[in-house]
């Protein structure tokens, strides 16, 4: 490979891929291009920065220069890729272009901001860069509105509350974590958040935001309103697909790839939050780690299909942490819930009494690995 491998992106997926390639081949040319600084940080830490009193720069684990030196890379930080010429095997920016033999899209996903009047007043916490842009406002805010009661929204609500802020969480669902599990399973965490002082506005809708002399006025449905100092959108992620679309690749929710992480173009692959693997978008660390291991082999000529086992998802709410696995969102499961002071074990079984999903909390989380082994592949 005279031109080697070009990777667009520098997040967790890109770094895992680099490490796995270098374990097998120390010499193949590797070029990384990204719009950010390319410094390494642990993205899940963003859910805890406020209670930990961390600044954006405190999150940096390794600088781009150290990364390049350690793994023998060509890095192009603060560089926006404008186009991919798939036929000519060329990646273009405004001032540069790069030939590739194999190209990997690791462009991640963007935080979705609800399209309401005043949406520009909403903050997002999807990257170190985004946190850096709003850390002063968040640190100084006494009253915080979090829009979205999913995984990230629940983590942030607890974190801001632990930091002593007045937190309101709004979601149009009837319970928190509604896309992940039924209300009878999430109710333990929901109750804990309420006990801590989080004001939950469920089955409610944000209709608009407006700057006032003393903060931000949030207008809600049913003629309600509340004034806050900061509003955070935690309404999910949308895979970044614009470049792939311009390159003529097949797109659905994400960049469509097969079990080999290959797109509709034989020399272009996708990895991480931007990828849709056989119809599934999996924006969690473990599937990305396993995908990076397989893709490294495939880029180096060892065709290996990705086989994902049942995997744990961790909800990092320290006052009441949860682990879950399996098809927790399936509507047809019957839930067997055992709750005690040390924690909860909720088992989701099908009509044949086969375990299909589980959620465990607090001290009962140590049972997760045993339950994981009994889930079907």
UniProtKB/Swiss-Prot annotation:
Its main location: cytoplasm. It comes from the Bacteria. It catalyses: 2 reduced [nitric oxide reductase rubredoxin domain] + NAD(+) + H(+) = 2 oxidized [nitric oxide reductase rubredoxin domain] + NADH. Its EC number is 1.18.1.-. It is found in: Cytoplasm. GO terms for cellular component: cytoplasm. Its cofactor is FAD. GO terms for molecular function: oxidoreductase activity, acting on iron-sulfur proteins as donors, NAD or NADP as acceptor. Pathway: Nitrogen metabolism; nitric oxide reduction. Keywords: Cytoplasm, FAD, Flavoprotein, NAD, Oxidoreductase. Pfam families: Pyr_redox_2 (PF07992), Rbx_binding (PF18113). InterPro entries: FAD-bd_OxRdtase, FAD/NAD-bd_sf, FAD/NAD-binding_dom, NO_rdtase_NorW, Rbx-bd. One of at least two accessory proteins for anaerobic nitric oxide (NO) reductase. Reduces the rubredoxin moiety of NO reductase. Belongs to the FAD-dependent oxidoreductase family. This is Nitric oxide reductase FlRd-NAD(+) reductase. It comes from Escherichia fergusonii (strain ATCC 35469 / DSM 13698 / CCUG 18766 / IAM 14443 / JCM 21226 / LMG 7866 / NBRC 102419 / NCTC 12128 / CDC 0568-73). The lineage of its organism: Bacteria, Pseudomonadati, Pseudomonadota, Gammaproteobacteria, Enterobacterales. The gene is norW.
